[in-house]
Amino acid sequence: MITDEEIRKVIAPLLLSGAKMLDKHCPKCGSPLFEKDGRVFCPVCEYREKQKKEMVKGVEERLMEKLTQLANSLPDDIDELEKHLRVMEKIIEVLEKYKKLEGRR
């Protein structure tokens, strides 16, 4: 189902830019398909994919910041150092999972 936000942010600007709305619909989301510059596409699915990638990128950036912060503040105490390293290891595991979800290595 198409939201009002998607109509405002995606479909309306496409129509104004000269894209042609086709009489076919996306099998995934039900949005009308569009054609522009010889390319047929679903603007809603592309918009949603872009939003998802931006969200994942934001999470990755925050995790990298935290990893850097931990790496720059390693304690001298062995017990505390072990805690830091375990947390850093978990962050790296999560980052790797995010990369696999996005299909990159």
From Swiss-Prot:
InterPro entries per record: SSSCA1 (IPR009563), UPF0148 (IPR022954), UPF0148_domain (IPR051888), Zn_ribbon_RPB9 (IPR001529)
Family, as annotated: Belongs to the UPF0148 family.
GO biological process: DNA-templated transcription
Pfam families attached to this UniProt entry: Auto_anti-p27 (PF06677)
UniProt name for this protein: UPF0148 protein PH0795
Signal sequence, renumbered to the chain: none
Domain of life: Archaea
